[in-house]
């Protein structure tokens, strides 16, 4: 059996800790034979465990402690610590592993709830489970979210080779915002969401680049954001914004500009991968 979980981008600018979008990069987990002990084969490196302390197995065992150990093989296109939901993908893969082997028959809603409890909020985990675009909130321990189709457009991911830990990126954020600024930040997010629902990517893109919640603080850790934004806008893109906590920058553009933008971004003197992606519509899947 095979489990496949997509990457995700969170925030989309002003949709801070609320908006998430599934992307066509994947964590894939092949479930092999039963074994005496858990072992997960992978080539990620970076100190990622191969035993039951791996997040995937740990998550599965928290849900189903009596699972029979298996040999697992993980392949992952999602680079860690780049703002593309690698930790959320691992958590969701663990939930799917337990659900599959223990026959828990969890609903998608239950999977989102469990994953959000682990990750703290649903912005990455909800689209990882459900696919497409999700707007969510966690209130008094309960998750509220809406899944909707995202407008058709090109997505160009500028993924620096250097990592940026979420903890470091959150550390530069203020504890509070002045009330008037928070009202303005909220109104920008509201217009962005309404524009997306209306398939108006030009207006949505303008709002994406006017975020007041987090990007102006995080830009000191991601100096290439302004450079990429200038290149993207000069060539007709809708917007460029941080993917999650960064350092990846995601460019939204008309499809006919995708290849040109990719080529232009590849010429920047920054060590990075520049990938053409799409919105992933299915979310986590199990292939039997």
UniProtKB/Swiss-Prot annotation:
Catalytic activity annotation: L-homoserine + ATP = O-phospho-L-homoserine + ADP + H(+)
GO molecular function: ATP binding; homoserine kinase activity
Superkingdom in the source lineage: Bacteria
Localisation per UniProt entry: Cytoplasm
UniProt-listed InterPro entries: GHMP_kinase_C_dom, GHMP_kinase_C_sf, GHMP_kinase_N_dom, GHMP_knse_ATP-bd_CS, Homoserine_kinase, Ribosomal_Su5_D2-typ_SF, Ribsml_uS5_D2-typ_fold_subgr
GO CC entries: cytoplasm
Major location category of this protein: cytoplasm
Disulfide bonds: none
Enzyme Commission numbers on file: 2.7.1.39
PROSITE patterns: GHMP_KINASES_ATP
Biological pathway: Amino-acid biosynthesis; L-threonine biosynthesis; L-threonine from L-aspartate: step 4/5
Coiled coil spans: none
Gene Ontology annotations of biological process type: threonine biosynthetic process
Pfam families associated with the record: GHMP_kinases_C (PF08544), GHMP_kinases_N (PF00288)
Keyword Nucleotide-binding appears in the UniProt entry: yes
Keywords, ordered alphabetically: Amino-acid biosynthesis, ATP-binding, Cytoplasm, Kinase, Nucleotide-binding, Threonine biosynthesis, Transferase
Binding site for ATP: 79-89
SUPFAM superfamilies in the record: GHMP Kinase, C-terminal domain, Ribosomal protein S5 domain 2-like
Signal peptide range in chain numbering: none
Family: Belongs to the GHMP kinase family. Homoserine kinase subfamily.
HAMAP family: Homoser_kinase (MF_00384)
Role: Catalyzes the ATP-dependent phosphorylation of L-homoserine to L-homoserine phosphate.
The protein's name in its UniProt record: Homoserine kinase
């Amino acid at each position: 059996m095979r489990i496949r979980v997509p990457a995700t981008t969170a925030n989309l600018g002003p949709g801070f800790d609320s908006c998430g979008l599934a992307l066509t990069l994947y964590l894939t987990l092949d479930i092999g034979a039963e074994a005496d002990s858990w072992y997960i084969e992978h080539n990620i490196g970076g100190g990622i465990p191969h035993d039951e302390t791996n997040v995937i197995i740990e998550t599965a065992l928290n849900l189903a402690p009596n699972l029979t150990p298996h040999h697992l093989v993980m392949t992952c296109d999602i680079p860690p610590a780049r703002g593309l939901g690698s930790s959320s993908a691992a958590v969701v893969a663990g939930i799917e592993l337990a659900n599959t082997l223990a026959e828990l028959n969890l609903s998608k809603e239950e999977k989102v709830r469990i994953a959000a409890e682990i990750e703290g909020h649903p912005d990455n985990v909800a689209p990882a489970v459900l696919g497409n675009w999700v707007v969510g909130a966690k209130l008094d321990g309960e998750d509220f979210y809406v899944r909707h189709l995202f407008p058709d457009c090109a997505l160009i991911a500028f993924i620096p080779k250097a990592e940026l830990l979420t903890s470091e990126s959150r550390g530069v954020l203020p504890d509070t915002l002045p009330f008037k600024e928070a009202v303005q930040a909220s109104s920008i997010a509201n217009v962005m969401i309404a524009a997306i629902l209306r398939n108006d990517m030009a207006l949505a893109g303008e709002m994406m680049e006017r975020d007041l919640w987090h990007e102006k603080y995080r830009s000191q850790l991601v100096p290439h954001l302004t450079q990429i934004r200038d290149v993207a806008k000069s060539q007709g893109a809708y917007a460029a914004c941080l993917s999650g906590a960064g350092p990846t920058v995601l460019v939204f553009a008309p499809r006919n500009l995708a290849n040109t933008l990719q080529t232009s971004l590849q010429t920047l003197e920054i060590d990075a991968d520049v990938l053409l992606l799409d919105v992933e519509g299915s979310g986590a899947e199990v292939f039997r």
